[in-house]
Amino acid sequence: MIIGLGSDLMDIRRIEKSIERFGDRFIQRVFTEIEQAKSDKRRMRAASYAKRFAAKEAGAKALGTGIARGVSWKEIGVVNLPSGKPTLEFKGRALERALALTPHGHEPFAHITITDDHPWAQAFVVLEARPIGHHFDGLAHG
């Protein structure tokens, strides 16, 4: 069952300017180590970060909190399943919120899609409650 839905549209130029202005301080404050390792290898580095930024925002909207209301940037991270498909990893208060939305006997899983077409990056998140024991290949608890 669907327990949350979120979307976000991000201007890649905004991320480019933040990286130029604040450098590693911005990147380390907003992005997980996994996201940094993935994005820093990309030719279109700012676009990669912008997609992840949009996914974090969309994930926070799917949780019903937004980033400012109790969930921090690094508590939502874009990770890839063994198949390469992206999903979200929730930690801390984001994980607590995901679990609070999830009915008894179920576990949360985030379906996401991210894309970019300069100057835009976009993300959609569908947060699903899956019955426990269903093939679980996504949301890591940590």
Swiss-Prot record:
Its main location: cytoplasm. Disulfide bonds: none annotated. It comes from the Bacteria. It is an enzyme of class 2 (transferase). It is found in: Cytoplasm. GO terms for molecular function: holo-[acyl-carrier-protein] synthase activity; magnesium ion binding. Its cofactor is Mg(2+). Mg(2+) binds at D8, E57. Keywords: Cytoplasm, Fatty acid biosynthesis, Fatty acid metabolism, Lipid biosynthesis, Lipid metabolism, Magnesium, Metal-binding, Transferase. GO terms for cellular component: cytoplasm. One of its GO terms (biological process) is fatty acid biosynthetic process. Its EC number is 2.7.8.7. It catalyses: apo-[ACP] + CoA = holo-[ACP] + adenosine 3',5'-bisphosphate + H(+). Belongs to the P-Pant transferase superfamily. AcpS family. Transfers the 4'-phosphopantetheine moiety from coenzyme A to a Ser of acyl-carrier-protein. This is Holo-[acyl-carrier-protein] synthase. It comes from Maricaulis maris (strain MCS10) (Caulobacter maris). The lineage of its organism: Bacteria, Pseudomonadati, Pseudomonadota, Alphaproteobacteria, Maricaulales. The gene is acpS.
